[in-house]
Design a protein with these regions (language model features):
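A short beta-strand micro-motif
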Residues: 24-38, 74-84
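Bacterial N-terminal signal peptides that target proteins for export
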Residues: 1-8
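C-terminal motif of bacterial Sec signal peptides marking the signal peptidase cleavage site
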Residues: 15-18
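Short, solvent-exposed interaction modules
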Residues: 70-104
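Second-shell loop/turn segments in exported
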Residues: 39-46, 85-90
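Bacterial signal peptide processing site
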Residues: 20-22
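A short, charged, amphipathic alpha-helix used as a generic interaction element across diverse proteins
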Residues: 47-63, 93-114
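Short, solvent-exposed mixed-charge patches
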Residues: 117-119
Length: 119
């Protein structure tokens, strides 16, 4: 009986945590914005169109959403190239440390074209 109670309690906590960390809803756009558990933007990638953004969003997880408007308060930037298809993407980050950490190890098919700098 205690096991069932614990499982029910853990399930409820997981559901509440998921709801609390949902980014604001809005119309889709070409800005893929990642947010922390408090809703603050930590990084953003500006894709050439909504379809490209939504493909990446499907792989990115729950902390990222394609938005029509870019996030405010991001202080650093870097330019990345996605191969294929050879698309340049502007990345924006909460600060230079976040930018340098994120771009120090990129997944296969992603290259750093322009290093981190203040916006």
């Amino acid at each position: 009986m205690q096991t069932m109670t614990r499982l029910t309690l853990l399930s409820a906590i997981a559901i509440l945590a998921g709801c609390a960390s949902q980014p604001p809803a809005g119309p889709p756009g070409k800005h893929l914005v990642y947010r922390d558990s408090n809703g603050a933007a930590t990084r953003q990638f500006d894709y050439p169109d909504i379809a490209f953004c939504q493909k990446v969003e499907a792989l990115a997880g729950r902390s990222a959403r394609c938005q029509a408007e870019g996030a405010s308060g991001l202080a650093a930037k870097a330019t990345l190239r996605y191969n294929p298809p050879g698309v340049l993407v502007q990345g924006q980050y909460s600060d230079l440390n976040r930018c340098r950490t994120d771009t120090s190890s990129l997944p296969p098919g992603v290259q750093l074209v322009a290093a981190c700098s203040p916006k």
